């Protein structure tokens, strides 16, 4: 919204992590969970364990019958990325690119830009750059000994004496969701989720919501999940049941 007041275009670095090897925390954990004898299924499961912030231990109990949640269907979706002659880390690259980037980050960012009538400038996601980046050898993307990624991009920055602007460690974009939960996140979730439309319509398990929503000492994974459910509920009321105005302010 702020960018809209300054320009009709928004520059984005989307694709940098997926194409040039930026998710070093994931690569390191994946390598500790797998070995040369790991099967494609075992690697798919290990890959999911590298996304611990995106799930809760009792994930399968969160969904209602209408969602038809199944770990087996998720494994089936992922296993192809790990059933090929690529090296283990290159398999993770493949899964990352075909997962969150294509079906999460890119669609969401596009919708947000469309909402504010803006256009994205994403040079790393041009056809030419994607084609080029996919052919870069692994040793020019990730150093597993030092656990440093984006080696080609770092070399480019060094060439122009700009490497001091970055750190060797991958810094994720993180919001302190626990503080958000304690300040007003929990009360908002209670307001919208205790009698939620997504639970009434069978997408989310009402018993799961009731079990955790009043707890004050929730693990951050549950906090993150509740905030995600709040977003789902708001979207559902806006576009499915249509009993909520787009001008409504959450307070």
Positions of predicted regions on the chain:
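Adenosyl-5′-phosphate
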Residues: 5-11, 38, 42-251
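Short acidic/histidine-rich active-site segments
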Residues: 7-23
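A mobile, often basic/glycine-rich helix-loop segment
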Residues: 20-45
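Short, well-structured alpha-helical segments in soluble
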Residues: 1-3
